[in-house]
Regions:
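Sec-dependent signal peptide recognition
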Residues: 2-10
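A short gly/proline-enriched turn/hairpin at secondary-structure junctions
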Residues: 55-64, 80
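Short, low-complexity N-terminal intrinsically disordered segments enriched in polar/charged residues
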Residues: 11-44, 48
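Hydrophobic pocket/interface hotspot
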Residues: 34, 46-47, 54, 71, ...
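Beta-strand elements of well-folded, non-transmembrane domains
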Residues: 39, 108-110, 127
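Short beta-strand edge/turn micro-motifs at domain boundaries
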Residues: 118-147
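A mature extracytoplasmic/lumenal domain signature
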Residues: 50, 60-61, 91, 104-108, ...
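Surface-exposed, charged secondary-structure patches
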Residues: 71-114
Length: 147
């Protein structure tokens, strides 16, 4: 009887670990992590969230990059008044086993918490192995990337 209990406890713990792994890597978590690392200006962490090449459609411009440092220039963004960005909403448009598109609304703020701009972006994510990665960002307006 103790043997069966030990097996059940082991299976429970193993399944808990698997679901914790999934909870830490799903499209919404990747989007949240992206905004967190964007605000931290951590290019290396941002690069880890993307499936290369990074593809950005911003207004009428298309940016294809090997690193997020080719997409954004933080020094120029700060000169333009940017201090941080905040997600207002993220809603799945398409959600499949290995592909997802999220409509994400976000706002940029200055260092006095005054809104600079709000916009929607469509973020396409793909699953590579066990991990979700950002693939394409489509922002319909000409929002500055600091470039």
């Amino acid at each position: 009887m103790i043997f069966i209990r030990n097996i059940l406890v082991t299976l429970f713990l193993f399944s808990s670990l698997l679901s914790a792994k999934d909870a830490n890597n799903n499209p919404e978590k990747v989007i949240e992590d992206f905004f967190y690392h964007f605000n931290e200006m951590d290019i290396n962490k941002i690069n880890e969230l993307w499936d290369l090449p990074i593809t950005y459609f911003v207004g009428g411009e298309i940016i294809v990059a090997k690193s997020y440092s080719e997409v954004v220039n933080y020094e120029n963004l700060k000169k333009e008044g940017w201090s941080y960005s905040k997600i207002n909403s993220k809603n799945p448009i398409v959600s499949q086993e290995d592909f997802a598109i999220y409509k994400t609304n976000f706002t940029r703020f200055n260092n006095q918490d005054i809104e600079l701009i709000s916009t929607d972006t469509n973020l396409t994510l793909i699953k590579r192995g066990d991990y979700w990665k950002l693939k394409i960002a489509i922002i319909p307006i000409n929002i500055s990337t600091g470039r």
